[in-house]
């Protein structure tokens, strides 16, 4: 059930990314009402999905030994042929891009919170979180171009992550699950 749940949560994350990124790339004005929820849905779904490859290993407390670490027996590296390792790479990349896409949309809001904060520590916290956002035309132009780049990056990333996740089934030795149509499917 763990790999099935992994695929389900990745699919939920893909839905959030595609809703937000495709609507941004097609310049849909009504996107602003749903983009924050779709991007947050992606982040929380990817966090949930990221746990299932660890649970799939069977012994969660042994997850440490999957990572390469220095030892006295020479360098030990992970098995790059394992689809679970590629799941980790795919989910890590997908999570990073989704987090950047989500947080770049929060920058103007962080600046608003900074400007409305009454306490000094809150002003300082939101000032750091806003990365010096002032709302100038230059900042809005850069924000728009960054959002377009991240949306353009995350849309094909959805397809690549989906392909890597489907390799879990395409490369398995379970009868009935081995087929070459899974990665593009």
Predicted regions mapped to residue ranges:
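Central hydrophobic cores of alpha-helical transmembrane segments in multi-pass inner-membrane proteins
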Residues: 9-25, 47, 98-101
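Long, contiguous internal "core" modules enriched in hydrophobic/ aromatic residues
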Residues: 75, 80-185
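N-terminal regions that are enriched for targeting/export leaders
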Residues: 1-12, 76
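Hydrophobic alpha-helical membrane-insertion segments
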Residues: 42-56
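Hydrophobic alpha-helical transmembrane segments of multi-pass membrane proteins
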Residues: 5-9, 54, 86, 96
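Membrane-interfacial loop-to-transmembrane alpha-helix junctions, especially the N-terminal start
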Residues: 33-40, 149-155
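Transmembrane alpha-helix boundary signature
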Residues: 53-65
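Flexible loop linkers connecting adjacent transmembrane helices
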Residues: 24-39, 62-74
